[in-house]
A protein has these predicted regions:
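Catalytic phosphate/metal-binding cores of nucleic-acid and nucleotide-processing enzymes, i.e., regions
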Residues: 2-158
Length: 158
């Protein structure tokens, strides 16, 4: 199957649990993380392997230039995110998809981490996941983490 995702979507053996890292620019330095760069690749990876085969999923919020611009131009100074200004799907869209997938397939979510540098985006994802877990009468455990990673810096100027 040649759909542009290359080797990143290799199906794991049934007994191997997957650690998935969603980030458009950074790559974890340590661990056995599989890296996906955007929403479509994220969804395809989970559909291929099955949600039940994931141990941990770590989400970034800002997955493209318009998301970063919204963070620097609006979220950072005004403490809010206007999702209408963001063209690309974000980590929040991935969180919504995960919850829908969990509900539809009746599969519990794996441990969800958020490693985004955007504190408002992180809080939105964490709140969404933990509210879902609480509604399902499950322990809340979605947390913000720092995972050592390669550094790719993007600067945006007015």
């Amino acid at each position: 199957m040649n759909d542009g995702f290359g080797d990143k979507r290799k199906k794991k053996m049934k007994n191997e649990k997957i650690y998935l890292y969603l980030d458009d620019t950074r790559t974890p330095k340590e661990g056995n993380w599989e890296v996906v760069r955007g929403y479509d690749e994220f969804v395809a990876h989970i559909r291929l392997n099955g949600l039940e085969n994931y141990e941990v999923i770590s989400l970034d919020h800002d997955l493209g230039e318009s998301a970063m611009e919204e963070y620097y131009n609006n979220a950072k100074p005004n403490f809010e995110i206007n999702y209408k200004n963001i063209v690309e799907k974000t980590g929040m869209d991935c969180a919504r998809w995960l919850v829908a997938e969990s509900m539809t397939k009746e599969i519990p979510l794996p441990q969800i981490y958020v490693h985004s540098a955007n504190p408002i985006g992180s809080a939105n994802i964490i709140g969404y996941i933990n509210n879902y877990l609480k509604n399902q009468r499950l322990p809340t455990g979605c947390v913000s983490v720092k995972i050592p990673h390669t550094i790719t810096v993007k600067q945006f100027y007015d």
